[in-house]
Amino acid sequence: MAHKKGGGSTKNGRDSNPKYLGVKAAGGSTVSAGTIILRQRGTVIKPGTNAGIGRDHTIFSLVDGVVTFRNGRNNKKQVDILPS
């Protein structure tokens, strides 16, 4: 019989790398064409006027202008770029 219990391994001890999601350019800020406005998982916020969407659902600016957030159809948030 064992005098001490075996030192078993733990099931914890892992951590995933940060993904740096979220808004990168706030509403009212000036952006140039190609600037990333927000990174997200899925289309939580949809692109509106003068905004494009990438393969990973990243929303970016298509023109130079000012970022505005608004509620679009079905109360879904949208990002627009007002050209400057």
Curated annotation (Swiss-Prot):
Coiled coil location: none
Lineage: superkingdom: Bacteria
GO aspect biological process, one term: translation
Stored PROSITE patterns: RIBOSOMAL_L27
Regions crossing the membrane: none
Name of the coding gene: rpmA
UniProt name for this protein: Large ribosomal subunit protein bL27
Keywords from the named record: Ribonucleoprotein, Ribosomal protein
Segments for region (Disordered): 1-21
